[in-house]
Amino acid sequence: MELPVIQPGRPRETQPPIFEKIGIVGLGLIGGSIAQAARQLWPTSLVIAVDNKDVLETAMRMHAIDVAADDLIVLAEADIVILAAPVKQNIALLDELDEYVRQPAVVTDTGSTKREIVAAARSLPPRFTFVGGHPLAGAARGGLEHARPDLFAGRPWLLTPQSLRSAESLARPHASVSHATPAANASTAASAGPVARALQASDPALERLFAFIRALGAEPRTMTVETHDRMLAYLSHLPQLTASALMQVVGDAVGQDGLGLSGRGLADTTRLASSPADIWKDIAATNADQIGPALDALIAILQDLRRDLFEGERLTEIFTDAARWRELLKR
């Protein structure tokens, strides 16, 4: 494939671009959806994508991107670089940006863990502004074929600015205590609005990123990397591992014929079991210290249920509490 390839035929601009040249590395579900949304929102901006040849050719046929390349050199003039590959690949890509991206740029990622990549980003040259990012808009099935421009509509997009720790410590001295409960952490994250506004006012790059995310339809929220990884261990990583483990147990026990007898409950409960393992291996490896306690908590509940199968007292307590929490779950 000749590189770069420029996609012709753009409609007239509908709103002024926030970034003129949008670089996206990795055109899976998230990267592909960002590309599609950006191309619709800012027709005069260039959407530049880096991936393998097959994915890029598909994206060009879908009119999802303008410039396609299998080499980071195409990002030379990007003013925002979005790393949307698996977590460990994103971390490795940071080392290459200095060589290929020649001008000041906002750099962000879309990975499900934040501590390792934010730590690695501290070695970036000062012309780059790195902000860890995580759009909470995934789906059970990944890949460009499932991308859509409205994927982020109304969804939270978590940001972990490197300047947040000092700002949060001034506003809420106890926000970073490591043994805080998930419920307390949720309260901390929800109350970060004033801090986020202060950060935007003092950081033009962060302000542009907030505007970019809002234009995609998402709701940007800020938190520390520690709070992010602790909360996501329970909100995302534990449900994924649980769904995969449950599907394996059931499949091994009843086989293909038995699965044909299952109702909607099993399908709904194990929807996440279709997720790609390569992405989740990186997530597990970079958040193991937080996922481990979450798994331990689940195992303890399962052991309670196992011991109480005949009596039912503990089972009733667990079902009652679970139903109460389920009613509060945001859909």
List where the protein language model places each region.
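NAD(P)+-binding Rossmann beta1-loop-alpha1 motif at the extreme N-terminus of oxidoreductases
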Residues: 2-72
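Internal alpha-helical scaffold of NAD(P)-dependent oxidoreductase catalytic cores
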Residues: 152-177, 183-184, 190-271
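Rossmann-like NAD(P)(H) cofactor-binding subdomain of soluble oxidoreductases
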Residues: 95-145
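Rossmann-like NAD(P)-binding element
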Residues: 71-108
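Residues at the starts of beta-strands that form the adenosine-phosphate
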Residues: 21, 46, 129, 156, ...
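Short secondary-structure boundary/capping segments
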Residues: 14, 72-73, 99, 121-122, ...
